[in-house]
Amino acid sequence: MKESLPITLRPNEPMSRHTSWRVGGPAQYYAEPTTPDEAMVLAAWAMTHRLPLIWVGRGTNLLVRDEGFAGVIASYRGQRWALHEHGETAELWVEAGTPMAGTARRLAAMGWAGLEWAEGLPGAIGGAIVGNAGCYGGDTASVLIDAELLLNGSERVVWPVTELGYAYRESILKRPGADGVPPLVLAGRFRLHRADPKVLMARIGAIAAERKRKTPAGSSCGSVFKNPPGDSAGRLIEAAGLKGTRVGDAEISPIHANYIVNRGQARAADILTLIELARTTVAEQFGVMLQLEVRVI
């Protein structure tokens, strides 16, 4: 496997370096392609060597098991963007590796509304498109026009938002392709409209303050579970008496029960134990089976 590639492959790369939980064993190979061509070359290389390939974002919604992953984990890092203005509206084309929150702030300062709800949202554009990220009254599905995808590791296509199967924190992009190679989001196109920059920046500031107030300190992946219909996962976990429960250095936050925080040297196994404890206890006490929002590999 020493053939020359236009992209750096890092063997036995600890995934704890690439997840916001700061846990995770080694990927057999890790790479960060920055262009569609690099992504296609990497996918072809993985298929040639019969190595499973997983595309990830910035690791802000990801738990990698302690044993790591026998294959290739790749994070697409392209960050080009272009704004096409049409009077009082605009279309933003932006690559998947671009930070979501930074994009929201940049547009708000320019007087373009549509993504200000994403202030403080961890991760990048691609992850938001895959998971239909949303908060504070907005979500990806409501402003996305279409997504540029890489299918089967070689076919570039553009799918309109109506074909992405969006639901609460769900899309068909979470499912593997027919040949086992998962789809990769290369870019998205978003619908924006003009607004007063001062009003938008005030909204950004209010959301930032609210996030700071509610978000526990420490390394975490944000909300661990999806909210069940008509209820809150955090409320259920708190009502089950699990706030502050600790396994090793992993803790169900005493501030927000839908957060599990790494207090130092937590292992993925510690976090998984707390996840299973929360699911089992809530199911036993309230008859609700919590569904994961984070991705586990």
Curated annotation (Swiss-Prot):
Gene3D superfamilies named in the record: 3.30.465.10, UDP-N-acetylenolpyruvoylglucosamine reductase, C-terminal domain (3.90.78.10), Uridine Diphospho-n-acetylenolpyruvylglucosamine Reductase, domain 2 (3.30.43.10)
EC number: 1.3.1.98
GO BP, sorted A to Z: cell division; cell wall organization; peptidoglycan biosynthetic process; regulation of cell shape
Highest taxon listed in the record's lineage: Bacteria
Start and end residues of each FAD-binding PCMH-type domain: 22-195
UniProt entry keywords in alphabetical sequence: Cell cycle, Cell division, Cell shape, Cell wall biogenesis/degradation, Cytoplasm, FAD, Flavoprotein, NADP, Oxidoreductase, Peptidoglycan synthesis
Residue numbers annotated as active site: R169, S223 (proton donor), E293
Function (record text): Cell wall formation.
Family per record: Belongs to the MurB family.
Name of the protein in question: UDP-N-acetylenolpyruvoylglucosamine reductase
